[in-house]
Amino acid sequence: MTASVILGALSFGTRVDEAASFDLLDQFTDLGGRWIDTANNYSFWIDPSGLGGQSETVIGHWLDQRPGARDRVLISTKSGYEPVSPGGPPEGLSAKAIRAAAELSLQRLSTGRVDLYWAHVEDRSVPLDESVGALGELVSSGAAAALGASNWPAWRVERARAAAAGQGVTGFTAIQQRYSYLQPRPDVALPESGHRLVFPETLDYLASTPDLRLWAYNTLLNGSYVRSDRPLAEAYNHPGVPRRLAALDTVAAEEGASRNQIVLAWLLAHDIAPIVGVTTPEQVGEAMAAQRLQLTADQLTRLTAAG
């Protein structure tokens, strides 16, 4: 599978109403986009109910109202971090929780199967074999085509893959973690405590595991590459950042592109699938145009070597 821009649907049904979400989905697919990424807990922290499901519901309504759309798109969703009640603890990854969450996600999405099902977070309170077995059942039952681990450390992913092999069930073939062109300082905690960053160890693990792919989220750093009103977090306050931004600006000028587009093109050139959360048509257009950029070997070398 060649890496492509993935539409992040976190804001659908909350910050972006249903009609506007439909427009963004139409635009994305009209421009050739295929993958749509959501989760069963999007977005409980925004919705007055204190529970998620709004994003999946909007996508399901869109599929219902667009005959043939399901055959043109690929859908990924996640479970593990939806609150069990407003303000309550997350559902976790017990076999019971996974089965219940998957069934509800399929109902909301108005589909019989998702193309990739993610364990959204770790749950070390549950035996790994139990979670792995329940996830594997989703594939054997036809509810999911493939499985991924979101916000898991590399060693736990590998242990889970070994457990799946031991049980004779499908294991993880994708990792989803936070990654972008600018790299934060590892000694400064990010405000989003549940996020797990890609580190050199992660990339080394992926390079030695060819059947495991990386999906990157927060690729555009909440707009910080291009918006002065959204400064970079403290974790990005180090000497390497100005050097990388200078290289980014040079290549952007050479290509007549935006910083965001060069970041996405750089990720794609490294076979990393960037998830781009969108709320406006302009953001969809910018992201899909980035997919058409072909950076030269020299440009990629300069970008990677900077900082």
What does each model-identified segment do?
Residues 29-30, 62-74, 106-110, 136-139, ...:
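Acidic (Asp/Glu)-rich catalytic clusters
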